[in-house]
Amino acid sequence: MRSIYDQEMRDIQRDSIHMCNLASETLQDVMDAVRRRDFTVVERVLEQDQRIRSMRMALNERVMRMIATQHPVAVDVRRLFYIIHLADEMERIGYQAAAIGRCILRTQYGKVLLLEDIYRMSERTATMFERMLASSLNESTDAVRNVLTMDDEVDVLYEQIYRECITRQSGLRSQDSDVMTAVNVAQYIEHVGDHIVNWARWWLYFVGEQDSDIIV
């Protein structure tokens, strides 16, 4: 029975990492689609979003079944609850990527204003994601504060893009769809950063970090 229990724990952890990798790939794909105006890639992003949602549901069911039937020890219960919250954040990141994709599909010719600024935002969030994944794989907290600092940088970039878009819109009589697309895409990327911060906080919960200025 113990071997079955250990194998199930390994399988759940493996699948949670697979979900993280798919969410990361989806983010990269959608930003490549934005830069290249590639609508076929957007369709793949929407499909990947659905896969992530299905994976989250399946993973949560397995975790709850294991808690109910296997009576895991305290440290494993803590890990399993962390995995549930991790899966939730990955689903939300997939949702944000899909939302960016839908923005591009609605935009004539796939034009996005302030593309370089938006891409800098996405690169920051991609780095945040990579560092959090490395921290969880290494069971380390070394990168967490760096991730939080980078999220502050993402927020600053979003505010800059937002102000620039408002300035551009203010001189127009009607709403400019290209301006609104830039605002929306930047906002979705900013939300991705927030989800990675949530991931960081749940990771600290799992490892037992009691730093009150991070865990809120």
What positions do the PLM features span?
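Cytosolic, long alpha-helical scaffolding segments
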Residues: 1-216
